[in-house]
From Swiss-Prot:
GO terms for molecular function: small ribosomal subunit rRNA binding; structural constituent of ribosome. Its main location: plastid. GO terms for cellular component: chloroplast; mitochondrial small ribosomal subunit. GO terms for biological process: translation. SUPFAM superfamilies: Ribosomal protein S18 (SSF46911). The lineage of its organism: Eukaryota, Viridiplantae, Streptophyta, Embryophyta, Tracheophyta. Keywords: Chloroplast, Plastid, Ribonucleoprotein, Ribosomal protein, RNA-binding, rRNA-binding. Gene3D superfamilies: Ribosomal protein S18 (4.10.640.10). InterPro entries: Ribosomal_bS18, Ribosomal_bS18_CS, Ribosomal_bS18_sf. This is Small ribosomal subunit protein bS18c. It is found in: Plastid, Chloroplast.
Amino acid sequence: MDKSKRPFLKSKRSFRRRLPPIQSGDRIDYRNMSLISRFISEQGKILSRRVNRLTLKQQRLITIAIKQARILSLLPFLNNEKQFERTESTTRTAGLRARNK
């Protein structure tokens, strides 16, 4: 058979199946902070099901647990550290002192 007539065959690459993020022994509970924190972004947002690789039922339970933890103030609603950072800025009184001299 001529090279140009041969059907194109994809090379079979082996791939490792990722472990599920929630094992059968894990309890989805609002008090289980080590489990819940894996499904929250750095900003404090709940990650999507596609990113988490969860089933629909697991994602629903995780979402409810995160919301309960937020209401009970175990988790912050927003995780925005930039808001609390202090930058060196001139205060109003420092500007007045310079003007008075």
